[in-house]
């Protein structure tokens, strides 16, 4: 036992030579010699975090010290087991660090920091957790109903699904950070929650937190009011995985953006997984700091678009099965044909069908389905300003084709003739200025173009208007005619 204590004291002496006073205090002052079994020397750490960090930072150096001093066969084993769990006999035999090596108080002199010891202790409280960390970090916002197994995969979301599943299996590796973007009700939250649930299942030792951007903001504001910002930072910067939903809700909120920036850096630099969802690509976020947007684009940005007909049918079938109702094929196809907005609206249609069956005890016919569809479409228009978008799109297209003498099939086709390409650039620019459509939605309207292509078109017309008077006059004339209609 005495030999083992001497070996541990030797290790401390050698490491002390290479660390600053504060580093040495942070990592080694609270270590405690527990016991030696054979060639294993067991050392107690204050908590699991401390244990993991000690092993990560100093294992190589400790092995080097042992080898250089002829103790190749000796192994230092760190544990977060408390010395209090040992018997009184073992307690009387163990030697703490303070007994085998001088404390900072004894070491104080001209070579040490002039800063008071208590001040050092206060500063490092943010760095070392003094309390034992829970083995399982419970996340109150993760809902078990969201799983990869009940997520319906189609061409519109397959890439996002595969990336999300990969993240769950190997967090903090390939796709970090990851940002999933797309319109309302397309499954972003489902995937984000599924990542949390699957990761918790596969890696139950990890600390995973799912929050909406609104919750994140509210917590931050509350921490300022109660003077507990340190607690807020500590909560979010010791995570293994942070999932934030609807990041676009933080637009125009500089204070929380600043906090998110530093939280992002702290986690990213420690290879912790970050996943966000947004209703648009990062480049389209307004009143959002450039340095934060650049952080989002470091990893994978993947979009989810509206479901095609086949996927809409599959979604309705699955929802009907879950609700225990049988939907005739003609009814199912009618709903899938008419409700083209998103998954949420499709499920709402099935819920309404179930209500008619359960509450009114009637058979579903075409008239009832038409009524349900009409209610959903009217509500969708009211909440998304869709009428003005649809009117504008038709007006824009009509005026553009007429003024530029371009055929309908060409503007939405793949012709690379200069005049057609130019017309597409203008079309994208006008759609961007007269509607609330995202670049992804605009891309689909003008022939399946990508977000990057649409953004290029918009920026090109912007540049051309500034340097080409003829182009500027043409765009101004087109915009005036669209406004009149």
Curated annotation (Swiss-Prot):
Q: Where is this region: Domain II?
A: 74-140
Annotated region (Domain I, interacts with DnaA modulators), positions in chain: 1-74
Q: Report which superkingdom the organism of origin falls in.
A: Bacteria
User: What cellular component GO annotations does this protein have?
Assistant: cytoplasm; plasma membrane
One GO BP annotation here? DNA replication initiation
UniProt entry tagged with the keyword Nucleotidyltransferase: no
InterPro entries listed in its UniProt record: AAA+_ATPase, Chromosome_initiator_DnaA, Chromosome_initiator_DnaA-like, Chromosome_initiator_DnaA_CS, DnaA_C, DnaA_dom, DnaA_N_dom, DnaA_N_sf
Principal subcellular localisation of the protein = cytoplasm
- Name the UniProt key words of this record, in alphabetical order: ATP-binding, Cytoplasm, DNA replication, DNA-binding, Lipid-binding, Nucleotide-binding
According to the UniProt entry, its GO molecular function terms are: ATP binding; ATP hydrolysis activity; DNA replication origin binding; lipid binding
Where is the region Domain III, AAA+ region? 141-357
Annotated ATP binding sites? 185, 187-189
Record-linked Pfam families = Bac_DnaA (PF00308), Bac_DnaA_C (PF08299), DnaA_N (PF11638)
Record function comment: Plays an essential role in the initiation and regulation of chromosomal replication. ATP-DnaA binds to the origin of replication (oriC) to initiate formation of the DNA replication initiation complex once per cell cycle. Binds the DnaA box (a 9 base pair repeat at the origin) and separates the double-stranded (ds)DNA. Forms a right-handed helical filament on oriC DNA; dsDNA binds to the exterior of the filament while single-stranded (ss)DNA is stabiized in the filament's interior.
Check the record and name the NCBIfam families matching this protein: DnaA
Whom does it interact with, and what assembly results? Oligomerizes as a right-handed, spiral filament on DNA at oriC.
Name of the protein this chain belongs to: Chromosomal replication initiator protein DnaA
| Protein species of origin | Borreliella afzelii (strain PKo)
């Amino acid at each position: 036992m005495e030999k083992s204590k001497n070996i541990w004291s030797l290790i401390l002496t050698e490491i002390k030579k290479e660390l600053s006073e504060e580093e040495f205090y942070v990592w080694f002052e609270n270590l405690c010699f527990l016991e030696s079994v054979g060639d294993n020397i067991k050392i107690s750490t204050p908590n699991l975090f401390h244990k993991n960090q000690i092993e990560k930072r100093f294992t190589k150096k400790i092995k080097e010290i042992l080898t250089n001093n002829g103790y190749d066969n000796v192994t230092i084993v760190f544990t977060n087991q408390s010395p209090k769990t040992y018997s009184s006999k073992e307690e009387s035999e163990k030697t703490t660090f303070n007994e085998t090596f001088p404390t900072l108080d004894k070491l104080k002199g001209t070579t040490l920091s002039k800063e008071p010891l208590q001040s050092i202790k206060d500063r490092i409280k943010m760095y070392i957790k003094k309390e034992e960390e829970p083995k399982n970090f419970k996340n109150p916002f993760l809902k078990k109903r969201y799983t990869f197994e009940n997520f319906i995969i189609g061409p519109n979301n397959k890439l996002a699904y595969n990336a999300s599943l990969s993240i769950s299996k190997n967090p903090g590796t390939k796709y970090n950070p990851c940002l999933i973007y797309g319109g309302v009700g397309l499954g972003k939250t489902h995937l984000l929650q599924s990542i949390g649930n699957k990761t918790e299942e596969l890696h139950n030792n990890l600390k995973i937190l799912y929050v909406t951007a609104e919750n994140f903001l509210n917590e931050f504001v509350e921490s300022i009011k109660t003077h507990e910002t340190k607690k807020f930072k500590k909560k979010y910067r010791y995570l293994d995985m942070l999932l934030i939903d609807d990041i676009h809700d933080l637009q125009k909120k500089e204070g929380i953006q600043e906090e998110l920036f530093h939280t992002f850096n702290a986690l990213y630099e420690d290879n912790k997984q970050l996943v966000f969802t947004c209703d648009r690509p990062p480049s389209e976020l307004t009143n959002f700091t450039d340095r934060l947007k650049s952080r989002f684009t470091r990893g994978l940005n993947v979009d989810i678009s509206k479901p095609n007909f086949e996927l809409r049918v599959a979604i309705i079938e699955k929802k009907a099965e879950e609700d225990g109702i049988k939907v005739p094929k003609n009814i199912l196809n009618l709903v899938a044909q008419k409700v083209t907005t998103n998954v949420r609206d499709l499920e709402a249609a099935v819920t309404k069908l179930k209500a008619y069956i359960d509450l009114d005890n009637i058979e579903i016919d075409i008239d009832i389905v038409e009524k349900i569809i009409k209610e959903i479409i009217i509500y969708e228009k009211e909440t998304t300003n869709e009428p003005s978008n649809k009117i504008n799109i038709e007006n824009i297209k009509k005026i553009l084709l007429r003024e530029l003498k371009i055929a309908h099939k060409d503007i939405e086709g793949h012709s690379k003739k200069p005049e057609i390409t130019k017309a597409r650039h203008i079309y994208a620019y006008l759609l961007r200025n007269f509607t609330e459509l995202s670049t992804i939605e605009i891309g689909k309207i003008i022939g399946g173009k990508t977000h990057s292509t649409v953004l290029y078109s918009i920026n090109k017309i912007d540049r051309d208007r500034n340097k080409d008077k003829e182009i500027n006059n043409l765009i101004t004339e087109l915009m005036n005619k669209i406004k009149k209609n």
